[in-house]
Amino acid sequence: MSKKKLTTFGETIKRLRKEQNLPQRKVAAHLDIDTSLLAKYERNVRQPSKELIIKIAALFKVDSEALISEALTDKIAYQILEEDADSKLLRVAENKVEYLKKQNNG
């Protein structure tokens, strides 16, 4: 069983842009953002809004939910990295997510 290669949101959008031979300035213009902001997204310095991720997905004709998931998992991973969290903390967070799901479903 092979594992899927992990990538960041920024790496993914950079790859998609290069596969379509699009310069950053054209992608940025299409998304109505500054080129420097797109570069920050590609370098994982900043995270775009959900609305912008949907626009990016439409531009590159990819599944928006997959891109949103990738951006969200990046955000979680960076937060855990910053907090120097261990696996015990991750298990507690998983349990809390399950608890919150049950609370929200009544």
PLM regions and their residue ranges:
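A short, Lys/Arg-rich alpha-helix, primarily the initiator
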Residues: 1-19
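Helix-turn-helix DNA-binding elements, focusing on the entry/boundary residues of the two helices
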Residues: 13, 24, 35, 50-53
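Alpha-helical residues within the helix-turn-helix
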Residues: 18, 29, 58
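Residue-level detection of the helix-turn-helix DNA-binding "recognition helix"
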Residues: 18, 32, 43-45, 72
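Short alpha-helical DNA-recognition segment
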Residues: 21-40
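DNA major-groove recognition helix of helix-turn-helix/homeodomain DNA-binding modules
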Residues: 32, 49-66
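Short, charged recognition helix plus adjacent turn
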Residues: 66-106
